[in-house]
Amino acid sequence: MAKHPVPKKKTSKSKRDMRRSHHALVAPNLTECPQCHSKKLQHHICPSCGYYNGRQVLAV
């Protein structure tokens, strides 16, 4: 049977945590829709009213 490669040295908690430092989740940046005042993603059509950039783009 073939042997699988294994780490030669134990990874310290510091090295492990430094590697994981970029793994945090980022909360979506929600803004208020100027038309209906519901929460929406920036640079996206409002899912409640269908407005984007001051004009209706989607019939809701």
From Swiss-Prot:
Ribonucleoprotein as UniProt keyword: yes
Swiss-Prot/TrEMBL keywords: Ribonucleoprotein, Ribosomal protein
Basic residues composition bias: residue spans: 1-23
Pfam family, one: Ribosomal_L32p
SUPFAM superfamilies attached to this UniProt entry: Zn-binding ribosomal proteins
A GO CC term assigned to this protein in UniProt: large ribosomal subunit
GO molecular function terms attached to this record: structural constituent of ribosome
UniProt key word Iron-sulfur: no
GO biological process: translation
Region (Disordered): 1-26
Classification via NCBIfam families: rpmF_bact
UniProt family annotation: Belongs to the bacterial ribosomal protein bL32 family.
Name of this protein: Large ribosomal subunit protein bL32
Species name: Deinococcus geothermalis (strain DSM 11300 / CIP 105573 / AG-3a)
